[in-house]
Structure formats: structure tokens, C-alpha cells
């Protein structure tokens, strides 16, 4: 609905949410790896809708509507399917209009209702590489948990022995795949 009427740049994101067959870059995602895309996983496991995660304020919707009419929004390029994709936004940017902190996008009373300390305790069995312990400072949920592309274990940037959950990517692989997909899509246009 949203993509059909107004948000043409949402096609790539909707496809990753609805079927999980491709990520926002238009790259095929094997069935066994689809659960690593949190939008798809939440839709399949909990029936979460787009608006279940993206909770816009009225002022945000008006601003987006005006930007859409004026064509004043930033497109990063086209994906491999020729669909426009937007510049990546952080969780802090996605929650700014609500006056919420970035991790509140995920950790709130409607979704993952727990504190940072409770999350760290729940994953304590991961040992010294517990990604929720923030041994190196605070890391936003979205730095690892990706909604419309395969999730990435950020710890792997420095720790080569960091465990990769099923379907997840090491940071280097994720960066290379995204860059390769964008380059291929944009060279196809030329």
C-alpha cells in the first residue's frame, strides 16, 4: 500500500519484508538466511507490519509527504532490481521525531520489553564475546541487527573469532556485498 501510492523508494524495503527473497540491495537471500533480516523475521514470526516498527508522528508524516511531493529526499542509488534505495538511516534518526533514543526503536514496551542489563544477562552464555555487554562502548541495536538486509556481527570488525549466528554476515562481507550490489546496479544504468 505505502509503496504503491506514495513511497516508490519503499519497494526494495517492502520486498525484503514481505518475502525475504531479496534484501534491499536486490541481492537474493537464501531461505535459510532470511531470518537474519529482522523485518522479514518479525513479519513471519510475529505478524509485525511496517508500521509496527516504523511508528511515525503526524509531523513526521507531513514532512515526509512534503518531501515526497517536492522530490526532496535522498536516494543512495538503485538496487540490482532497479529499485531506488534511500541513504541508510540510524535508529536514532528513525526515532528522533518521537523524542526517543535510538535503541528504543527495538527495546520498548511494544517489542523487546527489557533493559540493556536484562539483555546482557539473557545473552551471558555467549561468554567474553557477548555482543550485548558493550565492552567497547554503547553500540546501537541496528549496528548489528539489520531490518532489510542480512544482519552483521559488528564484533567481527576486530575480533576474527566472533561467532556468526546462522545467516549473519561478517562486517567485511556485508560491506563488500553492499558495495558490489550498488556498483553493479549503477553501472547497469550507464
Where are the predicted features?
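Short sequence/structural segments immediately N-terminal
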Residues: 1-190
